[in-house]
C-alpha cells in the first residue's frame, strides 16, 4: 500500500463531525470565559448564557463550524497520518518492514500539521469566535460594561463579508500568529500521547487500536493538549474577538502585555478547566470516529489473534 492514503482524510471528516457536535456547547462557554467579561467562573458563565439565550445560546454559530471544522479536521488528520507514514517509510525503506513509528517522525508530523492547521483553520476559528461573542457585554474605555442586544452579524456569510469589508482579506487571519504558537506545540501534545497511549492500552493480540483504546487515549490526549494550550488559546481568542466592537490589541505581545497588566498572570489560565473537560469528550469522539471510520473504509476489523 502506498504511503499516501485518501481514507485518512475521509475518516478525519467523519470524526470531525462527531467532535463538533459533542464539544460545541463547552466551546462556547470556553470562548466567552476567555474573551468576554462579567463571568465569575465556568458555572456562572453557563448559568448566564442559559438565562440570557437559553439552550440555543450554547450552539450559536454551530452551522459554520459543523460544515467547516469537519473539513478542517479531515485535512489535519490526513496531513498528520500521511506525513508520519511518509517519514517512517523514508527512514526505514519499506513501511511494513521497518520498526514502529519513532518519536521524531511523530514530532515532525505533528509540527507540520500545526502549521497547516493555521492556514486552513484560522478563518474558521475567527468566524466561530465572532459569532459566539457578538452578543456579549464588552468593556468600552472607562465606561464599564456595555451590553449588545442586537447581534453584529446575521450569520456566517454576513460575518465573512463584514470582516472582509471592514478589515480586508487579511482580517480573516487575525490572530494567526497566536494560533500558530498554540497549534504547533498543541498538536504535538495531541497526536503523540494518543499514539503511545492507544498502543499501550490496546491488547497485543489486537490489530490496530481497539474502540475503547481510541476513546480513552483520544480523550486523555485531548485533555492534555487543550490544557497545555490554554495560555496561548486565551491570547488567540482575545485577538480574534477583538474587532467585533473595539480594536484594542496590536498583536500577540501587546495582547499578552495588556491582559497581564489588567488582570494578572491568572488570566492566561482562564477557561483551563472547561478546556480540559471539553477536550476529553471532543477528542474521544474525534479519535473514535476516525478509527472506526478508517477500519470501515479499509474493510478491517479490530480482531484478536489466537
Swiss-Prot record:
SUPFAM superfamilies hit by this protein: Mitochondrial carrier
Key words, A-Z: Membrane, Mitochondrion, Mitochondrion inner membrane, Repeat, Transmembrane, Transmembrane helix, Transport
PROSITE patterns for this protein: SOLCAR (PS50920)
Transmembrane segments annotated in the record for this chain: 9-29, 61-81, 107-127, 184-204, 212-232, 272-290
Major localization class: mitochondrion
Domain of life per record: Eukaryota
Membrane topology: Multi-pass membrane protein
GO cellular component entries: mitochondrial inner membrane; mitochondrion
Subcellular location: Mitochondrion inner membrane
Pfam families xref list: Mito_carr
UniProt record similarity statement: Belongs to the mitochondrial carrier (TC 2.A.29) family.
Name of the featured protein: Solute carrier family 25 member 48
Amino acid at each position: 500500500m502506498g504511503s499516501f492514503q485518501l481514507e485518512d482524510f475521509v475518516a478525519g471528516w467523519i470524526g470531525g463531525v462527531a467532535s463538533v457536535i459533542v464539544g460545541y456547547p463547552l466551546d462556547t462557554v470556553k470562548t466567552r470565559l476567555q474573551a468576554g467579561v462579567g463571568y465569575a467562573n465556568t458555572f456562572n458563565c453557563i448559568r448566564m448564557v442559559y438565562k440570557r439565550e437559553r439552550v440555543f445560546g450554547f450552539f450559536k454559530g454551530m452551522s459554520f463550524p459543523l460544515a467547516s471544522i469537519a473539513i478542517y479536521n479531515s485535512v489535519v488528520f490526513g496531513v498528520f497520518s500521511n506525513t508520519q507514514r511518509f517519514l517512517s517509510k523514508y527512514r526505514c525503506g519499506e513501511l511494513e518492514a521497518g520498526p514502529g513509528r519513532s518519536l521524531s517522525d511523530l514530532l515532525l508530523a505533528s509540527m507540520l500539521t500545526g502549521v497547516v492547521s493555521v492556514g486552513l483553520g484560522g478563518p474558521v476559528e475567527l468566524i466561530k469566535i465572532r459569532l459566539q461573542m457578538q452578543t456579549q457585554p464588552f468593556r468600552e474605555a472607562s465606561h464599564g460594561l456595555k451590553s449588545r442586544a442586537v447581534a453584529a452579524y446575521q450569520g456566517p456569510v454576513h460575518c465573512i463579508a463584514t470582516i472582509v469589508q471592514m478589515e480586508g482579506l487579511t482580517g480573516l487571519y487575525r490572530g494567526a500568529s497566536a494560533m500558530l504558537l498554540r497549534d504547533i506545540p498543541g498538536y504535538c501534545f495531541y497526536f503523540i500521547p494518543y499514539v503511545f497511549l492507544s498502543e499501550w492500552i490496546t491488547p497485543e493480540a489486537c490489530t490496530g487500536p481497539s474502540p475503547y483504546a481510541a476513546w480513552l487515549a483520544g480523550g486523555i490526549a485531548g485533555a492534555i493538549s487543550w490544557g497545555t494550550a490554554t495560555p496561548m488559546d486565551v491570547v488567540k481568542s482575545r485577538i480574534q474577538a477583538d474587532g467585533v466592537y473595539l480594536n484594542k490589541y496590536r498583536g500577540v505581545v501587546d495582547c499578552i502585555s495588556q491582559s497581564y497588566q489588567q488582570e494578572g498572570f491568572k488570566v492566561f489560565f482562564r477557561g483551563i478547566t472547561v478546556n480540559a473537560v471539553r477536550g476529553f469528550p471532543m477528542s474521544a469522539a474525534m479519535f473514535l470516529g476516525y478509527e472506526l471510520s478508517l477500519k470501515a473504509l479499509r474493510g478491517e476489523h479490530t480482531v484478536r489473534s489466537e
